[in-house]
Amino acid sequence: MKKIKTLKKNYEFKNVLSKGRFYVGKYVIAYIQKNNKNENFFGVAVSTKIGKATKRNRIKRVIRECYRLNQARLKKGFNIVFLYKKDSKFEDIKFSNVIVDINEVFDRANMV
């Protein structure tokens, strides 16, 4: 299994958020930008306005796992940042709900 390449630096996130195209789902907003490389880079951001750290970490784990399962079927050469929508209820953050939402976002972005 391939390791997920992640965006780590603040300027990498800012670059994708400012120059990338965005696609809105029910639970997440995906910002996608071409990177002219032969691999995808991935990042997740959850606002501190959403609960305590345990809730935010749970949300990030679910989103990362959904990305990991879709990673093999995606087109290569993109930077992808997922933002969790603040108006979504934490109780709705079930893996089955989020994976359907992320699949729809990738379909709309023509990444499959």
Describe the function of each predicted region.
Residues 1-112:
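Positively charged, solvent-exposed patches that mediate nucleic-acid binding
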